[in-house]
Amino acid sequence: TGVESARDAYIAKPHNCVYECFDAFSSYCNDLCTENGAKSGYCQIAGKYGNGCWCIELPDNVPIRIPGKCHRR
């Protein structure tokens, strides 16, 4: 249909892991999120998956953190 939707979520690395962050005032997460098509992003401290990048209006084609294990190698 050509219509893309977006959602607010933790952007995920391969293996269902969050992009960790440690500074709520750093531009790291906003840069990461906007480079992946989101409206904006920030470092969510002590969230559901620890300190991770949370994106606002992230396109559906970008992986997000889902329930289940983070499979680090």
UniProtKB/Swiss-Prot annotation:
PROSITE patterns to which the protein is assigned, alphabetical? LCN_CSAB
Is Disulfide bond given among the entry's keywords?
Answer: yes
Which residues are in the LCN-type CS-alpha/beta domain?
7-71
Q: What does this protein do?
A: Alpha toxins bind voltage-independently at site-3 of sodium channels (Nav) and inhibit the inactivation of the activated channels, thereby blocking neuronal transmission.
Q: Name any one GO molecular function.
A: toxin activity
Q: Which SUPFAM superfamilies match?
A: Scorpion toxin-like
Location in the cell? Secreted
Q: Which organism is it from?
A: Mesobuthus eupeus
Positions annotated as pro-peptide in this chain are: 72-73
Any S-S bridges, and between which cysteines?
A: C17-C70, C21-C43, C29-C53, C33-C55
Tagged with keyword Disulfide bond: yes
Q: Which family does it belong to?
A: Belongs to the long (4 C-C) scorpion toxin superfamily. Sodium channel inhibitor family. Alpha subfamily.
The protein's matches in SMART domains, at most eight in alphabetical order, are given as:
Knot1
The protein, known as: Sodium channel neurotoxin MeuNaTxalpha-13
Q: What remark about domains does the record contain? A: Has the structural arrangement of an alpha-helix connected to antiparallel beta-sheets by disulfide bonds (CS-alpha/beta).
Give one Pfam family, short name only: Toxin_3
Tissue specificity statement from the Swiss-Prot or TrEMBL entry: Expressed by the venom gland.
